[in-house]
């Protein structure tokens, strides 16, 4: 008998990742493909199918019982559609329907859609930095900026699955126009492409042969480049303003930040915490702890699996097999050797 596994997809503006995950949260297989973010809807779906094909090639696929799909948002978990701001070709795109139509997805499997940042929040609360925390904001800062909320010890996803979408809180009413249609969104200051663009505008020049990415800007900032440092300071200030506003609204105990840009460490967290001290000044928002995500770049995958498990028992499951093991102290996660920031 094949060991039961959950499948997971994590679709973002830079990459499409997939994994097979056992009931303890351990990744037993993985596949990945670059996101053709400016491609057609068909190009994008072909990339998703490429990842599914890669997972289906593993023997563990035969034990698939549930399939979770985390996507950049907005998403609509009621209709199974996605409209990622940083993937223009997908607007109200029927992602769940298309994933279910893949020939290797078993007939009884119904993909469960969740926003990528909500998935990250589910993962960090189940087995990461927010484990045991009653009220937390978990953020993904990468090609875009997203968030998920833990309120009263439970994941709060909202009616359509978009609660916590902090990347599109306005932090500057006269700020740059966002692809979402609003001005001054957090994402236009703190996402990887925005950081790289502002660093260039501030005088940073990447080394010859090096692409102008947030990762390259972080390296330059650590070396003291003023333009790169200014870009990360600007990002930290925008994130701090949004975090302080969220804390004032729902009273947070903890903020967890993951995603590619968060891999820059104190280059981002230093200015963020400094600006947060200026913005979060009320008694119940002051001294709010900001911590890096514990599950690194696998949080979206683990969260997608957790969402799939929470949706109900898999086909043919025994009573003890209806959910991931919440009592497991911490999943054994095989992290990829490489990390990448939103570009």
Protein language model annotation of sequence segments:
Residues 2-46, 62, 81-82, 161:
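Short glycine-rich, Thr/Ser-proximal phosphate-binding strand/loop in the N-terminal lobe
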Residues 6-10, 63-68, 136-140, 146-148, ...:
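Short glycine-aspartate micro-motif
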Residues 16, 113, 117, 171-206:
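Glycine-rich phosphate-binding loop plus the immediately following alpha-helix
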Residues 21, 112-125, 263, 267, ...:
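Glycine-rich phosphate-binding/hydrolytic loop that grips phosphoryl groups
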Residues 41, 45-49, 53, 62-67, ...:
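Glycine-rich phosphate-binding loop and adjoining helix at the ATP-binding site
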Residues 48-67, 102-103, 129, 202-209, ...:
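Phosphate/pyrophosphate-binding loops at sites that engage ATP/ADP/AMP, CoA/4′-phosphopantetheine
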Residues 133-189:
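Glycine-rich phosphate-binding loop of actin/hexokinase-like ATP-binding domains
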Residues 186-256, 288-289:
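A mobile "lid/hinge" subdomain adjacent to the ATP/sugar-phosphate binding pocket shared
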């Amino acid at each position: 008998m094949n060991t039961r596994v959950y499948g997971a997809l994590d679709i973002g503006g830079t990459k499409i990742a997939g994994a097979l995950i056992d009931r303890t949260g351990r990744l037993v297989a993985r596949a990945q493909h670059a996101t053709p973010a400016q491609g057609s809807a068909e190009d994008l779906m072909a990339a998703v199918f490429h990842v599914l094909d890669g997972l289906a090639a593993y023997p563990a696929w035969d034990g698939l019982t549930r399939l979770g799909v985390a996507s950049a948002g907005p998403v609509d978990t009621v209709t199974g559609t996605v409209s990622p701001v940083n993937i223009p070709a997908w607007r109200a795109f029927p992602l769940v329907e298309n994933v279910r139509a893949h020939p290797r997805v078993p007939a009884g499997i119904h993909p469960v859609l969740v926003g990528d940042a909500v998935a990250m929040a589910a993962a960090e609360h189940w087995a990461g930095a927010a484990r045991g925390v009653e009220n937390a904001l978990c953020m993904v800062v990468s090609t875009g900026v997203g968030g998920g909320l833990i309120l009263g010890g439970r994941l709060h996803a909202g009616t359509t699955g978009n609660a916590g979408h902090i990347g599109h809180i306005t932090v500057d009413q006269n700020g740059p126009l966002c692809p979402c249609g609003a001005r001054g969104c957090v994402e236009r200051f703190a996402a990887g492409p925005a950081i790289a663009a502002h660093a260039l505008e501030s005088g940073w020049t990447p080394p010859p042969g090096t692409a102008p990415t947030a990762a390259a800007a972080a390296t330059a900032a650590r070396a003291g480049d003023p333009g790169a440092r200014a870009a990360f300071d600007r990002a930290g200030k925008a994130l701090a303003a949004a975090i302080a506003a969220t804390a004032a609204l729902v009273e947070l105990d903890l903020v967890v930040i993951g995603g590619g840009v968060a891999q820059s460490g104190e280059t981002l967290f230093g200015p963020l915490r400094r600006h947060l001290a200026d913005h979060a000044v009320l008694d119940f928002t002051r001294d709010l702890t900001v911590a890096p995500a514990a599950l690194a770049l696998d949080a979206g995958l683990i969260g997608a699996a957790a969402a799939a498990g929470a949706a109900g028992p898999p086909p043919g499951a025994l009573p003890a097999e209806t959910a991931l093991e919440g009592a497991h102290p911490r999943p054994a996660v095989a992290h990829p050797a490489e990390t990448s920031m939103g570009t």
